[in-house]
Amino acid sequence: MIRTILQQYRSESAFNRDLGDRFERLIRAYLKLDPQYVALFSDVWMWKDWPEREAYGYKAPDTGIDLVAKLRDDEGFCAIQCKFYDTPIPLGDLGNFFTLSGKGGFTQRLIVATANLSNNAADALENQTIPVEMMTLEDLESSPIDWSQFSIEKPDQLRKLPKKDPREHQSEALADVLKGFKSSDRGKLIMACGTGKTYTSLIVAQEMVKLGQTILFLVPSIALLSQTLRAWTADASMPLRCFAVCSDSKASRNEEDMRIYELAYPATTNAIKLAKSIAETQDNTAVTVVFSTYQSIEVVHQAQQKTGIEFDLV
């Protein structure tokens, strides 16, 4: 459905500037509604409307940054560039974005693109001093936004899909798990493919932890981490404060797995940063969830050693 919306934008926009403006406004509305980004950003502005733009010395009306988001649990901002392209995006078309967002005030970067990156551009996103994430058309398609309800006349009024309700077999699995934990402190839930293991893990977690407690969720790949993070934030009935821990090194990443920037969510392999972030944000208003790949579990362990953080559910 999102592809149909974008095609309508193309057919109705006489100029590339108009097309870009429409796409930017759509992405701003999306970031302010998708639970994954609502938990990450406290506000999102068009570049020209960013209230602190001049305070940070940025005066140009539009030289590479399209949107600015305030990081909810951080003093910094995220610079966002929206690329409405049909063909692979060359590195040269990202130059102004990298330069401008590196001058001050920004601690994260996000590129939202409707096309793939060229090989050189993709390589440039890795190992940046200011981390870069990339959101794709597929991310928008799989988001919890009900694109069928989108109105071209009211692009700021997006709607979310309703949250899932447990199916009978998932409710039975939940009951079995809770029963098992009455007599044991660990267990194994085995479910067939396609039966909703990720969602079942969420409803189990929601029954076992309360606000202010902490969960560690381990996965074998960056791709599965991305899928789980999106699924949990979309259907959770309690506020979640999420952290992603994963490595993009060739030694720890399967060739078929995603690159770390494709997670479209800030990730870290720095134990000190992880420990500091958890310690500074943990309170009784949300459940803290650390999503980590198996390969990066040592980072989580080091963070625990530095702060004494204990997980209530693993």
Feature annotation, model-predicted:
Residues L19-G104, A122-D123:
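Catalytic centers of nucleases
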Residues F98, Q108-V112:
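Extracellular/luminal Protease-associated
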Residues I65, G76-F77, F106, V287, ...:
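Local beta-strand N-terminus motif with an aromatic residue
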Residues M1-D18, F41-Y58, G102, T114-V314:
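SF2 helicase/translocase NTPase motor core
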